Design a protein with these regions (language model features):
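Short acidic-glycine-tyrosine-enriched beta hairpin
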Residues: 54-70
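A cytosolic small-molecule/anion-sensing beta-strand core signal
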Residues: 42-43, 61-62, 80
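Short histidine-centered beta-strand/loop micro-motifs
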Residues: 8-9, 20-21, 28-33, 50, ...
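Short, conserved beta-strand element in jelly-roll/cupin
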Residues: 21-23, 33-48
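Ligand-binding loop in jelly-roll beta-barrel domains
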Residues: 70-94
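Histidine-centered metal-chelating micro-motifs
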Residues: 27-29, 47, 66-75
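A short, N-terminal "cap"/entry segment at the start of jelly-roll beta-barrel domains
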Residues: 1-14, 18, 97-107
Length: 107
């Protein structure tokens, strides 16, 4: 994983749930996917930039939820040490087959 980001996931036939741990300053580069994404921040705080140029900024804090529609480009930065739970429908095939290069490049 990129930087200090770690994840654990379980996938069923129709959906996937993942626990993501980020340290303050960790970033997830802009990307998009055909999956609907529901992000629940358990602890910490994330800044997400949504849109082709990151024109919409949303900060999601502990106890808050964000739904990201399919195919919407987005990136994220941990403003604090953060634990979040992401649900994807359908499951993220790129995560399952380890072709999610945007999360594996650099450090």
């Amino acid at each position: 994983m990129k930087g200090t980001i770690t994840r654990r996931m379980i996938s069923g036939g129709q959906a996937m749930i993942a626990q993501i741990v980020l340290k303050k300053g960790d970033t997830v580069p802009r990307h998009s996917h055909h999956n609907e994404q529901i992000t629940y921040v358990v602890s910490g705080k994330l800044r997400l930039l949504l849109g082709e140029q990151g024109e919409r900024e949303i900060v999601v804090a502990a106890g808050e939820v964000l739904v990201i529609p399919p195919n919407l480009p987005h990136s994220a930065e941990a403003l604090e040490d953060t634990l979040d739970v992401d649900v994807f429908a359908p499951p993220r095939e790129d995560w399952l087959n380890r072709t999610d290069d945007y999360l594996r490049k650099g450090g």
